[in-house]
Swiss-Prot record:
Name used for this protein in its record: Matrix protein 1
GO CC, alphabetical: host cell nucleus; membrane; virion membrane
Region (Membrane-binding): 1-164
Coiled coil regions in record: none
Topology relative to the membrane: Peripheral membrane protein
High-level lineage: Viruses, Riboviria, Orthornavirae, Negarnaviricota, Polyploviricotina
Encoding gene per record: M
GO biological process, one term: viral budding from plasma membrane
């Protein structure tokens, strides 16, 4: 796996699924391929994206700044600086300085990542802030190692949260989660259907699913009533794909 592929993988792992994630993935691909050379426009676009947490925006801004060539006098962006200040905790800054001194002695991506994984997310963010604010300099490889270590820690905590959601025994949470997933699947079906002349069937199935969920939420139904809702939708989607000559079994 190449360095940039690894960085892209780690960064995308902390972004919630949805159309925005697909858009960010495309921007990252363009940046890493040298196709997007206007850093200021890129940062302005990032600043106004909804849903993303300030820290996620800070990490993306840091990655863009590392990768896109820019004029020396270009101002650092406040939204990135604020995100990478370790919540203003002096303890995080002290640890960030210690980590920075270690990273200065390292020259490899994997070495830097290994060292960085021993620190808290707050300290890692503060260390990125030091580098972003030009208070310290490391090689791009080392900076990317720091980015990936931070993303790994964030992804670990997100995964624990998802696992708790998936294994919860609370029937109301499970019921709502199934309905949310069904709506997300319906939206994906609509996007995949696109403008194809045979798309009306897929659009109708997706629309019916949305209406059913809306009715279930309005009336209030037994928590078991949503069981299998998403799977039914997926079966319909795969039957539609088969008729269209597309074989994809990756959604379950």
């Amino acid at each position: 796996m190449s360095l940039l592929t690894e960085v892209e993988t780690y960064v995308l792992s902390i972004i919630p699924s949805g159309p925005l994630k697909a858009e960010i993935a495309q921007r990252l691909e363009n940046v890493f391929a040298g196709k997007n050379t206007d850093l200021e426009a890129l940062m302005e676009w990032l600043k106004t994206r909804p849903i993303l947490s300030p820290l996620t925006k800070g990490i993306l801004g840091f990655v863009f700044t590392l990768t896109v060539p820019s004029e020396r006098g270009l101002q650092r962006r406040r939204f990135v600086q604020n995100a990478l200040n370790g919540n203003g905790d002096p303890n995080n800054m002290d640890k960030a300085i210690k980590l920075y001194k270690k990273l200065k002695r390292d020259v490899t991506f994997h070495g830097a990542k290994e060292v960085a994984l021993g620190y808290s997310t707050g300290a890692l963010a503060s260390c990125m802030g030091l580098i972003y604010n030009r208070m310290g300099t490391v090689t791009t490889e080392v900076a990317f190692g720091l980015v990936c270590a931070t993303c790994e820690q964030i992804a670990d905590s997100q995964h624990r949260s998802y696992r708790q959601m998936a294994t919860t025994t609370n029937p109301l949470i499970r019921h709502e989660n199934r309905m949310v997933l069904a709506c997300t699947t319906a939206k994906a079906m609509e996007q995949m259907a696109g403008s194809n002349e045979q798309a009306a069937e897929a659009m109708e199935i997706a629309n019916q699913a949305r209406q059913m969920v809306q009715a279930m939420r309005t009336v209030g139904t037994h928590p078991n009533s949503s069981t299998g809702l998403k799977d039914d939708l997926l079966e319909n989607l795969q039957a539609y794909q088969k008729r269209m000559g597309v074989q994809m079994q990756r959604f379950k």
